[in-house]
């Protein structure tokens, strides 16, 4: 009798343990970016959507951007904690292939694509009073090329290479995140800064308003996609860096600004369970209006844009994302 009771108790304990294990959601940590940049706000809104939908226990973390996020994905994913990364497509590409120095010895081969977010414009921001009109005018000026090792810095250096402008020719080179770059430009301690980010970027919108109050005006240096200045970046990342035009209404510039943009994607580790990847896709695209209300740049987040990226990158899609896209009839 006692033996039978003990067996029933053990079975009950086992079933309870199994139930708890099944009920426990995977923990998803989302690498975002610096405050003032779109990655930070997008990642925060994404985590909120996943939590409310019950897709995962999601937590956003502030980082230096794409490469930091990809390193977290590669190095910190363990057990039932999965690090997902918001990243530009060019950063994901060179991290996967090992062309980026910090991934040379250990490429981020475990990353898998979930969905496309929006394009990131290569902003070269200055003011009308600096007299900077083209990239070559940066010589002798105080310029920030973005945070060290960031996608902003890497693309800025490619633009400078195309324009035959060496950072050594600057009066002073800074390596600031977008919010600090905008603050320095507004205060007159910087002449221009690069930023690769969504349109609009809140820090640059605020900068435009600040400059207007001071009797100055923001100026985005145009980059002709057909110029040699643009071709270095476009050839480095064929199909991943494309022409893009920022309407004058976005930052209150005098004219629309032609330039270049790279895409942004959400990637996850290969080990993320297929059902969790599917649940993330379902949560995001069933709550797209909520995401777009929270982040203006999310107007470009769509299943169609995600499907267009399928097969364009050497990075495989996550099985959960593939299943969702197939159910919607967007891929075979």
Residue ranges: model-predicted function:
Residues 1-9:
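Positively charged n-region of N-terminal signal peptides that target proteins for export
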Residues 14-23:
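Hydrophobic h-region of N-terminal signal peptides that target proteins for export
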Residues 27-53, 116-187, 311, 315, ...:
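Bilobed "Venus flytrap"/periplasmic-binding protein-like clamshell domains
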Residues 44-48, 61-105, 124, 132, ...:
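Pocket-flanking alpha-helical
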Residues 89, 100, 130, 167-267, ...:
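Pocket-lining segment of extracytoplasmic ligand-binding domains
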Residues 104-117, 248-257:
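A structural signal for short loop-to-beta-strand junctions that line the ligand-binding cleft
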Residues 141-158, 236-279, 284-302:
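Ligand-binding clefts/hinges and TM-proximal coupling segments of bilobed small-molecule sensing domains
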Residues 197-215, 220, 232-233, 272-332:
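An extracytoplasmic/periplasmic, membrane-proximal ligand-sensing/linker region
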């Amino acid at each position: 009798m006692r033996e039978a009771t003990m067996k029933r108790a053990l079975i009950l304990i086992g079933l309870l343990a199994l139930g708890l294990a099944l009920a426990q959601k995977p923990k998803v940590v989302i690498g975002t970016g610096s405050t003032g940049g779109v990655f930070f706000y997008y990642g925060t809104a994404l985590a909120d959507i996943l939590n409310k939908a019950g897709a995962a226990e999601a937590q956003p973390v502030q980082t230096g951007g794409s490469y930091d996020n990809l390193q977290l994905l590669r190095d910190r994913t363990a057990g039932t904690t999965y690090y997902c990364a918001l990243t530009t497509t060019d950063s994901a590409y060179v991290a996967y292939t090992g062309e980026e120095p910090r991934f040379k010895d250990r490429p981020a081969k475990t990353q898998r694509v979930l969905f496309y977010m929006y394009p990131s414009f290569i902003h070269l921001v200055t003011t009308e009073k600096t007299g900077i009109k083209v990239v070559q005018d940066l010589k002798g000026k105080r310029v920030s090329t973005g945070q060290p090792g960031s996608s902003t810095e890497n693309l800025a250096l490619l633009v400078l290479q195309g324009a035959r402008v060496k950072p050594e020719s600057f009066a002073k080179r800074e390596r600031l995140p977008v919010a600090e770059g905008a603050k320095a430009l507004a205060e007159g301690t910087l002449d221009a800064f690069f930023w690769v980010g969504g349109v609009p970027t809140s820090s640059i919108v605020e900068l435009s308003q600040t400059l207007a109050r001071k009797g100055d005006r923001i100026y985005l240096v145009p980059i002709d996609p057909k110029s040699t200045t643009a071709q270095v970046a476009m050839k480095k990342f064929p199909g991943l860096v494309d022409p893009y035009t920022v309407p004058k209404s976005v930052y209150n510039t005098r004219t629309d600004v032609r330039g270049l943009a790279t895409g942004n994607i959400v990637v996850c580790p290969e080990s993320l369970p297929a059902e969790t990847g599917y649940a993330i896709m379902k949560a995001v695209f069933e709550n797209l209006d909520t995401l777009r209300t929270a982040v203006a740049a999310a107007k470009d987040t769509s299943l169609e844009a995600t499907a267009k990226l399928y097969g364009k990158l050497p990075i495989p899609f996550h099985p959960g994302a593939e299943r969702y896209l197939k159910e919607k009839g967007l891929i075979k």
